[in-house]
Amino acid sequence: MTGGPSGNSRVPVPDRVILVDKPVGPTSFDMVRAARRGTKGRVGHSGTLDPFASGLLLVMTGTATRISSLLMGLPKEYDLLVRFGAVSSTGDPTGSIMPFAPSASVAAAGDEGSTTSAPGEGRIRVSAQDVLRVLDRFRGRITQRVPLTSAVKVDGEALYKKAHRGETAETPEREVMVYDLTMVEFDEEAQTARLLALVGSGTYARCLAEDIGAALGCGGYAGALRRTRIGSFSVEDAVRPEDLSPALYAEPGRGVLSLDEALSFIPGRELQETEARLASNGNELRSLPAGRYRVYGYGRLIGIYEGSGEGSRPLVMFPTPAQGGGSPERPPAVQGT
């Protein structure tokens, strides 16, 4: 690491997952920079939030950086404000906003409902019932086209880099999961709907806003976005960026989780000595049922194993104290779970 205090003045970072309430404006990596101040060791985050979005960001320190992909796979809840009657070049308020002028074929998309054209403007206005009617189409497994402003790579290059150069590209389609989608507020005058969306990993909220607007035949984009939950972790328990400091990470507490607390969504298994020795070396285990498990032995968390019931292999291994890593202690209630 370069810059900042000298290495001797930095505090070794413990293994923590920190719930941070990111404000609108900063990038997700700005939160990582804030968490790194005064520390030495690895710091990262799981699940990027765009600068225009706010809410829950999981920042990981020390060995906890190894569980990033596990946390990224958890369902996420978003509070999404959709603005109808206009489109954005980026699908959000940071892009070029243009009034939506529907063609006859596009306007027909709203024929099923009570969409109306604004007098003298040729713009379609929608009602709360119109929005409720189309939401059913966006629950369950749906297909989204990856936005051009995403980090997904096409031809070996992130799409957003092409977008910054003004280039276009054929973006891939992906199947994603929307577990629940509820309208909690509708403003007919402003032509906005506030939605609560519980989605699977890889779902783009801005695409959801655009696709709902397209289904209504009026256009739409994400006017505001706040992530409220990741798995069982809530933004209500998060800390502010200005509170990030080595003193905060010293002990688990509100918004600061140990590895065991962060991995509580995965059941735990205590291993006998023979298998604990095998697991410590990253070998296959035969005793675990099908599924994914935290495995413990010698009084510590050894790793995360996954298998079919006929054999399990490590997904993540945690270093022993002799390897210079943390030594997550075994919680008292993992046996037989």
Feature locations, PLM:
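Pseudouridine synthase
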Residues: 158, 163, 192-236
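Acidic, low-complexity central loop/insert segments
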Residues: 70-143
